[in-house]
Amino acid sequence: TTPSVVQITKDEVKIGNAAKRAMVTNPKNTISFVKRLMGADFNDENVKKMQKLATYDIVNKSGKPYVKIDDKEYSPEQISSMIVGKMKKVAEDYVGEEIKDAVITVPAWFGDTARTATKTAGELAGLNVLRVINEPTSAALAANLMEDKKDKTVVVVDSGTGTVDVSVLELSDGMAEVLASNGDVYLGGKDYDDAIVKWVVDEFKKSDDVDLTKDNMAYARVVESAEKAKIELSSSSQTEINLPYISMKDGALLNLAMTLSRAKFESLVKNLNDRTVEKAKVAVEKAGKKYDDIDCILLVGGTTRIPSLQEALKKEFNKPLNQSVNPDEAVALGAAKQADILAGNSTGDLLLLDVTPLSLGI
């Protein structure tokens, strides 16, 4: 997958993994989580929170949040269009022809202004946006949950790098209605990484009396190793974190070598799992549904690979977890299926009606 990260310097623009790798050495020029600014007003509470957390400057331009890099100001749509443009090129390189049309997905809680801003980003990237659809609906389409046209109630838990979105869908005869949506734009895979980072930093401080947060390059290596450790612990009972020559003390080079067990990791992230489950519980309540009404829980986003999160969801809802589609690809695959239908290429007769009721409060 390609991280939604952009780094802008006077010499070049880096997008995706290249920007993510360069983030620690030049955080001021590196933009991430711009999705949180889409369609927002500068005085929104969410923007105020982003100003405190972002490594880059967010400024007021005509009542809207803009990203300021050096002496230039960029709208969220412009930054987002750079990411969309990169993906357009990746797709064109793969299929060997120009791509003009696209279906773009958004979180179910996105309001009209955020949806319009997303469509604008696609257009700035040179695309004709055929439709903007809800991410949980797209995931349900990818998982073939709508093909039999039977009535179903599905809870979609989408946990990505920086956000958790839980939606309750009612599927009926090719129609998908979002009954309720609930989430946290400040909870996701990065928080699981951060839990490991904190543990590593604390343990090293105890053993070697060196604070790795004071050294940007050392800290960047810890952050990178934490993400790898998290991924490995989804399939292994323990993992090794080895960072040779991580620091220096009294003229001697120091090595970092630690073993992190899955059990220890689970204890570090229990509160994150609990918060995600709570978001799902509230979504079901808002939808006016009982647990017995739920047919399955569809897992979307890389963070849902974490075994302890899966167990927490199973324990709470006692419902089957649908993992039939790669969680990193589910939303994109559903969008591709919808695009195929709209282009008239699909042999199926599914016409997706994606409904977001006003009762969602967006």
What kind of region is each of these model predictions?
Residues 1-63, 68-82, 89-362:
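Oxyanion-binding/catalytic loops of NTP- or PPi-dependent enzymes
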